[in-house]
Amino acid sequence: MFIAIEGIDGAGKTTLARGIGNMLLGEGYRVYMTKEPTDGMENYAGDGVELFLKFTINRYAHQREIDRHIKNGEIVICDRYIRSSYAYQFEGIAEFFGNSEKAWEWMDSVSEIIKIRPDVQIYVDVDEETAMERISRRGLRNPHFENEQKLRSVRQIYKGFQWDLIVDGGRDKEAIISETFEKIIARLRQEKT
């Protein structure tokens, strides 16, 4: 099983991914934790088109690693995946093309090289104010992406996608982890039958 966890910066994706991963390990499952962008790509700068291409190339290589672990019988949990690129780079790409529809078509076309797609896509939703408080506590890392206006627009794009599970990231983290874990376990059991 391949699980992708998405959401704006400060939503609690990493906390949820680690929590679920640890609980699955505790139940005897083999788990591989990964993230995007992969190491060395976090502080890349550029316009929307350039960033989308760079992250897609990074993801193209990363999907081989993910596939290897899936084939090895592990549950792969990825902190961000393809939808993050769509959500974070859409505005810049739409501006480049001067058209939202062309931007979506172009992103879909470029993303055709990504063949490994998540079995379960989880969206951690949190308001921009809460996200900024969390980001401030951990230390601002990328002011281009980690500001309230950008987070608001990215959040709206995320909300437009279909999700297997939407989690309220403003709730108690232990409750969120436990509830999400139970839903994943139920899905794993369902797949076994």
Swiss-Prot record:
Instruction: Output the GO biological process annotations, alphabetical, semicolon-separated.
Output: dTDP biosynthetic process; dTTP biosynthetic process; dUDP biosynthetic process
Alphabetical keyword list: ATP-binding, Kinase, Nucleotide biosynthesis, Nucleotide-binding, Transferase
Task: Name the Pfam families on file.
Answer: Thymidylate_kin
Q: Name one GO molecular function term.
A: dTMP kinase activity
**Enzyme Commission number(s):** 2.7.4.9
GO cellular component terms, semicolon-separated: cytoplasm
Q: What class of enzyme is it?
A: transferase
Q: Which reaction does it catalyse?
A: dTMP + ATP = dTDP + ADP
Where does this protein hold ATP? G7, I8, D9, G10, A11, G12, K13, T14
Q: What is this protein called?
A: Probable thymidylate kinase
Belongs to which family? Answer: Belongs to the thymidylate kinase family.
The species is Thermoplasma acidophilum (strain ATCC 25905 / DSM 1728 / JCM 9062 / NBRC 15155 / AMRC-C165)
